[in-house]
Amino acid sequence: MAEVLKKTALPFLDAIPCSVAMAGFEPEVAGADPNERANILKERLTQPESSRYDYIILDCPPSLGFITLNALVAANSVLIPVQCEFFALEGLGQLVKTMERVRQRWNPGLKIEGILPTMYDKRNKLSTSVLEELKKHFPDEVFSCVIPRNVTLGEAPSHGKPAVLYDVLSKGAQSYMTLAKEILAYG
């Protein structure tokens, strides 16, 4: 883990960015013993250097491949971002089913930390409809905080910064700060 860990502009935050080194993880897992392949990431995260962190956040691709499976096996809980768009509901359904299989086979303590509606646009009927469906089907899991569609959230990564450092006063950055407070208050 130490070889891929990078310091960030925030002294209390380290990151393992996607890189060429990470690209090799999926084939490595695919080639591993079938009885061990789901636990590779969990084993790496239980190394002594990981113990110095209060939280380890795994940002997974929007697929249910080996990387996501390994993250679910290693995780205590899952924060699920859901774009307020139609197909996102189908993806959420698949993820929930996958989480149930992971609970049964490898990680009985895995829970949904919360479902985070993202890219919400109150002027768009579909956005509003998706948010209503989320609250209807997951009344206890949907965060109060909703992340709006926001230009800053799209621009910040191209400048190599998180939104809160790129433009802390933007609606998008403020929304993520509200989310952090909500997680800390209830987590």
Which positions does each model-derived feature cover?
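P-loop NTP-binding core
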Residues: 1-187
